C-alpha cells in the first residue's frame, strides 16, 4: 500500500522542557493514498498542530514523519518549500487573500508563481470557482465577499495546482449546508484518485459521511480510528 502520511511517535511541544506544553504525544497515524481522512475531537486536542506538522509548517519535536514517501527532515529548507509547493495544498482558518486581487486572481496565484500565462491561469481559476458555486463572484475583491465565500476562494486556491495531498482545517466552518456539501463533494472526488489523499479537520458532523477514515483525537493522542461511511458502504457491498 502506498501512503500519503506515515507518522510514528510524533510529539510536538512548545516552550522549554521544564515548562513545556505538549500538543502532540507520541502519536502514530497512517493515511493511505486514495483516502479521505478526518480528524475529530475537542478544541485544543492537537488536530491543527498535527496537520501543521504534516504540512511542514511546524517541525515535530520527536518522532518520524513521511509525507508522500519523503522525509521532510532530510530536506534542506529550500527543498522543503519546493516539495510543499509542488505536492501539497492546504487551507487553514486564516485565509490570507490578497486584497487587491479578484477572487479568480487570488485562486490563480499558485499558477502565476509556476509561470502560467495570466489569461489561462485566471480562466482555470474561474472554472474551479464555478464548481464551488461562485461563478458570479469571480471578479469580486475579497472585501466584497462574505466569510463563507472567502473560504471557498481559499479552498480553490489550495486545489488549483492539483496537489497530491490536500490538508484542510475546518473547510466548511463558515459555509451553509449546501455550500459545505459542494466543497466536500469536490474533496471526495480528489480523494478517490489512487494517487491523491485528503486530510480534513472538522467539528461539522454533517461532513463525516464523506470520510474513509475518522481519527478521534484527545489530549494530543489518537484514541481510536473508525471506518467512515464510505468504507462502511464498500464493506457492505463486498
Language-model regions, residue ranges each:
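Intrinsically disordered, low-complexity glycine/proline-rich and charged
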Residues: 216, 223-224
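ABC family nucleotide-binding domain
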Residues: 2-218
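ABC-family P-loop ATPase nucleotide-binding domain
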Residues: 1-13, 224-238
Amino acid at each position: 500500500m502506498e501512503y500519503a502520511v506515515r507518522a510514528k511517535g510524533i510529539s510536538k511541544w512548545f516552550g522549554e522542557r521544564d515548562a513545556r506544553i505538549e500538543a502532540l504525544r507520541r502519536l502514530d497515524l497512517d493515511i493511505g493514498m486514495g483516502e479521505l481522512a478526518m480528524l475529530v475531537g475537542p478544541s485544543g486536542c492537537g488536530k491543527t498542530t498535527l496537520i501543521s506538522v504534516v504540512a511542514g509548517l511546524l517541525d515535530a519535536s520527536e518522532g518520524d514523519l513521511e509525507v508522500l514517501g519523503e522525509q521532510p527532515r532530510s530536506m534542506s529548507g529550500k527543498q522543503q518549500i519546493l516539495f510543499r509547493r509542488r505536492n501539497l495544498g492546504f487551507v487553514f482558518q486564516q485565509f490570507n487573500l490578497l486584497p487587491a486581487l479578484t477572487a479568480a486572481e487570488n485562486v490563480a496565484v499558485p499558477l502565476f508563481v509556476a509561470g502560467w500565462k495570466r489569461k489561462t491561469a485566471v480562466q482555470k481559476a474561474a472554472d474551479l470557482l464555478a464548481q464551488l458555486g461562485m461563478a458570479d463572484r469571480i471578479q469580486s475583491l475579497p472585501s466584497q465577499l462574505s466569510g463563507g465565500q472567502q473560504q471557498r476562494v481559499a479552498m480553490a486556491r489550495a486545489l488549483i495546482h492539483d496537489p497530491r495531498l490536500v490538508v484542510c482545517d475546518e473547510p466548511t466552518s463558515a459555509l451553509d449546508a449546501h455550500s459545505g456539501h459542494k466543497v466536500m463533494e469536490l474533496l471526495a472526488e480528489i480523494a478517490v484518485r489512487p494517487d491523491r489523499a485528503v486530510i480534513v479537520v472538522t467539528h461539522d458532523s454533517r461532513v463525516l459521511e464523506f470520510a474513509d477514515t475518522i481519527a478521534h483525537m484527545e489530549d494530543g493522542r489518537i484514541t481510536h480510528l473508525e471506518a467512515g461511511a464510505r468504507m462502511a458502504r464498500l464493506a457492505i457491498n463486498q
